[in-house]
Amino acid sequence: MDSSNAIFKSFLGKAPEWYKICIIAFLVINPLIYFFISPFVAGWALVAEFIFTLSMALKCYPLQPGGLLAIEAVFIGMTSAHHVKEEIMANFEVILLLMFMVAGIYFMKQLLLYVFTKLLIVIHSKKILSLAFCLSATFLSAFLDALTVIAVIISVGTGFYGVYHKVASGNSFEDSTDISNDEKIITNKEILEQFRAFLRSPLMHAAVGSALGGVMTMVGEPQNLIIAGQAEWGFVEFLLRVLPVSLPVLICGVITCLLLEHFKIFGYGARLPRRVWGVLARYNLLKEQRMTQQDRVKMGIQALAGIWLVVGLALHLADVGIIGLTIIIICTAFCGITDEHAIGRSFQEPMPFTALIVVFFTVVAVIVDLKLFEPIISYVLSADPHSQLALFYVFNGLLSMISDNVFVGTVYINEAKTALESAIISREQFDLIAVAINTGTNLPSVATPNGQAAFLFLLTSPFAPLIRLSYGKMLYMALPYTIVLSIIGFLSLEFLLPPLTELMSNWGWIITR
């Protein structure tokens, strides 16, 4: 084997050869487009290529191919290293969240698995169980960040999967085995596939639930805080102003959840195999029998840490990542986990995604520097006031499907604020536009993992390949929700928001500044 073949073989590891050739082609083509055709076209090509690497996440983790494309983009001048740093610092809360909050949830796994196992054993109806996951995620994400909620759900799902996988492999509950290795599973493969299909349903219901709750409050999503700051709204005012859109969407989202499970369409409706239920019930009984006073104390400490987590985030007592760090310290200190390697294991899952998010911010920097969204923004602001709400909602939604919704929301609200200060739009129109931006970035963005950081985190987590949740599968399962949420959001914005906002203003519930 000559050196060139050896380099090609080691390049991107076990990824398919056609995929390696695609990435090499992108790296060759991008500078040519940038220098000889148009920087604008090159920028959109980079965005499309990055989305492609995300869609192939099960073939190759997107960090390496996406990272190479991002490095080249900086090297040829599509953006600068300084601007990348500025984007990272502007989104540093997200970095801290991924580093510490996800690791903090790891140390609450014992309590979470105990509670959700009880839930799974007690609730026999798949519809009620799906609804419970959807509404739990909705409620939690109204006060917590959606990434935190998804981290909890992933932790629980991995726990369930691991319990059955060990038994199906012929091991006991206590054995330490590689749950990604199916070689020892011979007779139970069909049941394992059914279990995977079952796990995908509540996971996707919860993921969409996090978006339903995230749109409602100013702490639900990072861009909500930015929008609330520009509009000078408090917690209650934000909730009230968004309610004419968020409440109908929530009701229709819940109905969609029930209909999907009832008609067993779009990959939903798979039931928990009886044998798996038996394994989980035995596991729960065994844990109950073997639970010592020390175990109960540990779960009590984790419960108190969970209460602090909800209160701290709901009242915004500190940044999300800092609260996550306090969870790590409290849980490890009082549960007796002081070994450096034991603590280090909690960081194994979030760190690759944290690195991927930094690469994503590089692509965002390219979007800003090459003004890829500027033609759309100019078109929306030049429209007549009656059409502006619909246009802001639609274009926010479309751009949020392919780009970070925090970035899209920030760009649009800043442009709207500039238009207000320039007297291009009135204050009343600005308030309505702010709601359109908030709902536009949060609702249609469930269509793809690109728009919602929580969805991207789920797709690139180690749990996704275990249950065969690919990019395409996520698109397919999210499709009915995308259609319902987007249409109901649009209709509510057009026909309910202006009259109900005026009504609340007349009642004195909200004020026009």
From Swiss-Prot:
* Pfam families in the cross-refs: NhaB
Its domain of life?
Bacteria
How this chain sits in the membrane, per its record, is: Multi-pass membrane protein
Q: Where are its TM segments located?
A: 21-41, 88-108, 119-139, 243-263, 299-318, 322-344, 350-370, 389-409, 477-497
Q: What is its main location?
A: membrane
What InterPro entries does the record point to?
Answer: Na+/H+_antiporter_NhaB
| Catalysed conversion reaction | 2 Na(+)(in) + 3 H(+)(out) = 2 Na(+)(out) + 3 H(+)(in)
Cellular component GO terms held in the UniProt record: plasma membrane
Q: Does the keyword Magnesium apply?
A: no
What are the alphabetically sorted keywords of the record?
A: Antiport, Cell inner membrane, Cell membrane, Ion transport, Membrane, Sodium, Sodium transport, Transmembrane, Transmembrane helix, Transport
The record's subcellular location field reads: Cell inner membrane
User: A single Gene Ontology molecular function, please?
Assistant: sodium:proton antiporter activity
Tell me, in a sentence or two, what this protein's role is.
Na(+)/H(+) antiporter that extrudes sodium in exchange for external protons.
Recorded hits in HAMAP family, A to Z, give: NhaB
The family this protein is said to belong to: Belongs to the NhaB Na(+)/H(+) (TC 2.A.34) antiporter family.
Name of the protein this chain belongs to: Na(+)/H(+) antiporter NhaB
